[in-house]
């Protein structure tokens, strides 16, 4: 095979001693400093354009380029508004047609009233000229007033049908989009996820689908009603007198031009805002899912700033969008008022010329007033439609993407009897997300059926890639993989994955019971449809085989125990054993073990390894291992170095060869002579002793007491303050959820976000008031205009003069409205986007401030919190920006209109005002119902979003289990539940909304009947009547408009209460508290004095039971023991993630609970089992170890050299500026771990905590890193938790834990001589040559 020209020419022996280097060798002219300076863009979550992809893959041959492109390319969907309805069923479309007709009919009701109004105007003139009697006048007046009542009833029914129908259809279609989106996500190839963060999926499935729902629900009905009003009004105008109507229609062209020109900018800004929020969501998801790491390093501030970078970008585009909408609204109001002026001016000329009469002009003018006013109601909704289209384009681009490797496809063959012979022929592999690195080069390997083949080698050498290729997570760029002589590309993918069981290095469990988690292994197997009894037997049998049965039965709920999100309620070893049980329960033909026992302690590993050895008999097994003791008995051991096979053979053959394998063995060898005790005896002993307790959180805190009597008595004797505070804390948590806030408190709280904008907000309020006063002023001009047109023919000269004057006044009013509306639009855009920015930023910081116990609660899962950040902050803006400005504007309109009406005709005004309280009551009641509905709906969507996030972040496990259909069933069930719950609430709230909107007709009927009577008696003149009526019409409509914003206000109230609760929550261990003694220097003595501990979320499970432990300054101590025995808990207590229930942890004789937590933690550094990296460059990730930015490059380089990662970093094209991807996805486990170690070392800590710090490293790297850690530990107090005993044999003291107590302690030599528990653990990990 021809190698690419960029590949280094030589493969020297050093390669076996370090990570595989990047084949694209960096330019020698680039200095270290320059590399560090090159800041990489975190664009891992952006969908790539074809041009971007071609540029990235330009260095590869064409056929390789095509293979990688297929795995990465996301089509760009040009979404239109119609695209949003692509999943509407025939019933949906019929319902849409019905409710659309109802909306249109409801819109036609208001212009029909102008016909009645024009008719009455003629009647008023007749009575004034004594052409009809008072009785005749009264009869006509009563009949027309009844017509108003009929119109009101019709509009009530039509609006109710329209609102309920649109909300129902909107929710129904959005539900399908959510389901299709998750379905599409689950069908994508793994390379797609290497580019897409889990946080972005959460943002799409919550915030973006909510935007679509907003754009296809009740706002469509409101818009259709407004448009119908507009067109009906103009049709009526044309029927009455076409010339005048035609002249006024010219303004429509101006409106269309304004809306069309501005909406292009609106759509672009909306799209860019969503992109920025998606990237921010991924950062938030990364940080929240690794909160322990962020807390340990005190990097909350730095990570919050990283999140804010994306928020600022979103704020920039959001402001542009809102400003353009403000200017558009101002322009439309100006055009509308100019239209009035034009109508009056030309109408007066047609009247004088005898071409039409007063009745027709009044009808046309009023129709134009109402029609033009209604178009203003369309503008606020255009933003919702634009956002929906932008969100739709992003979601549909994923839905329409045809995956290169599609697990949902029915294509491909199956093999009737699988034997299990696997062959890799001429494999060359490049990961799609890192096209510059060749991971595998010319691999030829046969895995015989029924045999065990082990893969070993340095991390990053391509071992796990074998699993990825066999499972078809990726397609190789050259060569093929064969199963029983058939190319796996020709086989059905779902069927293929069902023949293979995979246990990976970091096991993923789902948020359900232990029983259901193991049962997932049966998907697609013949046993899946057996009886419940048979399935139960299989599951228990698999759990026993995997050495999980005993610990499961030790749990209060046994197999029905819920494991929590991603299994966080179990320790690493417990999770791993459940995963093994899941893998073997279906008796698979092919078993893949990718570091399957790496998370187990030595005792468990011995038994589980024996179980795996038994399970692998008679089936094809591929084992990937760093710990070589686990693969001694393999039929063939393949050593992979630098993406190539270096050597292969049995353990004995390879040891005799004295090649690379022997070097790996030597690195892990424990140099002690051991007795003759057989491993079998140790295994039997292990089975007897394995009973122990789970060491992590569960659901709720009831009390701080122990059910265990001895311990309870002990606690009663101590009766510490902390034990009491734990009880109080649990009670406080119970109360937290019940906290209710008054509306005033919440408004003050929301206003606090805009404190810096107070002055410009006052300007905005000033302009909003001026804008609001425009409507009543227009009523005065309108009444004056009608009075002018009522003048008799003898005064036509004065009529022309007055008409000219009032037409000019309308033009002036239009110009004033252009300035005031645009100004308030721009001002509130600044305020609204600042509010969203600060709310997101502060709530993210409030989350990062919380203690670890907060994140252990099931309702605070990563998905729920990420979803909260994306959706609730958007809802909060329901009382800011455009909404707040509009509410203030229409409130001013209502107040000024009613005041003017009272000033000019108090009798008629008082009668009309009497109806306004009823309107207000309807609106407020609807607001209250929507707030209730919002709270309930949010909870349902939150749980479904959290579930979707969990499924996506575990995509490899979902894919290998072929669990896609099961995930979809649960998700669709959650969506259906939510839809059923919301329908009843919608029906109630829509009833009140329809009432509040149609009540204005009853108000008009009353006003016309009573006012007409006053006019008929000669008590009022035409000016007073028309002024009062038009003021009340617009006043009532304004009240109706305020309540059309109720959904936004309802959401805002619900969101504000959630925010207030989060902000008011003061954690027990508060990083923002200045209290406590600050430590300038630390000696490093650490003591545990009779420490008892249970996790707050699982109080019935004791974890530490009277732990006593002393670490002297500079001492290196190691903690070993079975998983779940309390080792990692000890580290967590040293870090003060939790407070002890009784007893205390002391540093230099000081109780750590009385120290300032930030000051205390600054002297510690933690390297945990699962390395956590964040989006950004390698340099950024190393610098997260310190809380300052001005760290010299030399210090960064030194830390990386000490962690044995410097050479690898410098071999990358961008050096320290290399982007690590979402959660460090661009790097191997070993590379990530060494960067995490560099991050700890740059901190120069006095106390070093190593929680399985080298478990992810291969033997070669481990030896070097361990030496570096040993060197780093000098002069430092070091506590190391280890499963691999070769890493801690030089420890000053080794403590052996069992069930929360220390059962043995001493040096490595002393403990071996004791021949106790430690001796047994060492014996199991022996790497002696088998005989």
Swiss-Prot record:
Main localization of the protein described in the UniProt heading: membrane
A Pfam family this chain is assigned to: ABC_membrane
Cell compartment(s), UniProt: Cell membrane
Positions with biased composition (Basic and acidic residues): 31-41
This protein's record includes keyword Zinc-finger: no
Domain ABC transporter: 422-667, 1086-1324
Membrane topology designation: Multi-pass membrane protein
Sequence segments annotated as region (Disordered): 1-50
Induction: Expression is induced upon exposure to amphotericin B, the allylamine terbinafine, and itraconazole. Is highly over-expressed in strain TIMM20092, and azole-resistant strain isolated in Switzerland.
GO MF annotation, one: ATP hydrolysis activity
TM ranges: 93-113, 147-167, 219-239, 242-262, 325-345, 358-378, 762-782, 808-828, 884-904, 910-930, 995-1015, 1025-1045
PROSITE patterns for this protein: ABC_TM1F (PS50929), ABC_TRANSPORTER_1 (PS00211), ABC_TRANSPORTER_2 (PS50893)
Disruption phenotype: Impairs the resistance to itraconazole of the azole-resistant strain TIMM20092.
Catalytic activity entry: itraconazole(in) + ATP + H2O = itraconazole(out) + ADP + phosphate + H(+)
Other known facts: Dermatophytes showing reduced sensitivity to antifungal agents have emerged in several countries and, in particular, up-regulation of MDR2 expression in some clinical isolates such as strain TIMM20092 leads to increased resistance to itraconazole during clinical treatments.
Family membership: Belongs to the ABC transporter superfamily. ABCB family. Multidrug resistance exporter (TC 3.A.1.201) subfamily.
Function: ABC-type efflux transporter involved in the modulation susceptibility to itraconazole.
Protein name, UniProt field: ABC multidrug transporter MDR2
Native source species: Trichophyton rubrum (strain ATCC MYA-4607 / CBS 118892)
